[in-house]
């Protein structure tokens, strides 16, 4: 009889999020990033979207009972992930249901998807309130400028100091660790600037700003990269830094990927693929 396989070295990462048929965002982006960074990726689908690189035309929330069934079947009967990323939760009921599982999950990263790239709100106030509650149970939250403002019920930060203040305020509201993504906020040197805050203080994270319109799924990619790296890094900050470095490279190679006729996806496999496809 063959010996039982040793799975101790296999990092497992779960994404709880919506589906993007174009493959650039949602669970598709999550699983690509996790796989590219050496984790075994798994998924629980919370919503089906009709979207492409040109935009979203529809969202169908998966019934709460079926989301619970997916989670129970995976977690109770088979695999407990080493890390979990949580993304799109379209309704308050979904957010509250997923929140019930947080105490049993390790290394949880919440990407509070609430605002579209256009700046339009994707969730009603009841759902926003449920996501706020979820923020206090996750190990790390990764809102962008607009999402941080929605969580705090104030205007988006217009400066680095404002970004720092909002990160600290999110911590004051109960979030354990916060990474506020600066997005289009211009740093002192035109860098892409994010702010990380935890119990030890605040860190300003800078990376070169890449000039490209192909940025579909950047938030999904970053949060799932952090989750997949955290089990193999000594600290959350180290995982965040390495994930940000990976994302910068993925954005930098996005134009070479050349997929779609709108805002194309980043290149999740830029470290693996070659021009010959080997």
Located regions from the model:
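Acidic-glycine-rich active-site phosphate/pyrophosphate-binding loop
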Residues: 2-10, 26, 189-205
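Conserved N-terminal subdomain of the carbohydrate kinase-like
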Residues: 2-15, 31-117
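Charged C-terminal helix
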Residues: 10, 58-61, 77, 237-278
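Short beta-strands and strand-loop turn motifs
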Residues: 15, 81-83, 109-116, 142-151, ...
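Short pre-catalytic strand/loop immediately N-terminal to key active-site residues, enriched for Gly-Thr
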Residues: 16-22, 202-216
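Short, small-residue alpha-helix embedded
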Residues: 33, 149-150, 213-236
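Phosphate-handling active-site elements
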Residues: 37-42, 203, 229-243
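Conserved phosphate/ATP/ADP-binding segment of small-molecule kinases
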Residues: 125-202
């Amino acid at each position: 009889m063959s010996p039982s396989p040793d799975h101790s070295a296999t990092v497992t990462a779960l994404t709880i999020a919506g589906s993007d048929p174009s493959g650039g965002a949602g669970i598709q982006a999550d699983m690509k990033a996790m796989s590219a960074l050496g984790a075994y990726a798994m998924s629980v689908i919370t919503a089906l979207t009709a979207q492409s690189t040109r935009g979203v035309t529809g969202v169908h929330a998966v019934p709460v009972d079926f989301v619970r069934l997916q989670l129970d079947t995976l977690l109770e009967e088979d695999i407990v992930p080493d890390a979990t990323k949580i993304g799109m939760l379209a309704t308050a009921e979904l957010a509250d249901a997923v929140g019930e599982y947080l105490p049993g999950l390790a290394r949880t990263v919440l990407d509070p998807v609430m605002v579209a790239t256009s700046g339009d709100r994707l969730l009603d106030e009841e759902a926003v309130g449920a996501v706020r509650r979820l923020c206090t149970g996750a190990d790390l939250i990764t809102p962008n400028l607009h999402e941080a403002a929605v969580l705090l019920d104030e205007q988006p930060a217009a400066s680095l100091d404002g970004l720092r203040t909002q990160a600290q305020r999110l911590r004051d509201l109960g979030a354990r660790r916060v990474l506020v993504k600066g997005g289009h906020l211009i740093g002192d040197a035109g860098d892409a600037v994010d702010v990380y805050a935890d119990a030890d203080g605040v860190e300003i994270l800078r990376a070169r700003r890449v000039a490209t319109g192909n940025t579909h799924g950047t938030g999904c990619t970053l949060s799932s990269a952090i989750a997949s790296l955290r089990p193999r890094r000594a600290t959350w900050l180290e995982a965040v830094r390495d994930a940000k470095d990976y994302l910068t490279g993925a954005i930098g190679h996005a134009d070479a990927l050349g997929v779609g006729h709108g805002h194309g996806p980043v290149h999740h496999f830029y470290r693996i693929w070659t021009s010959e496809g080997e």
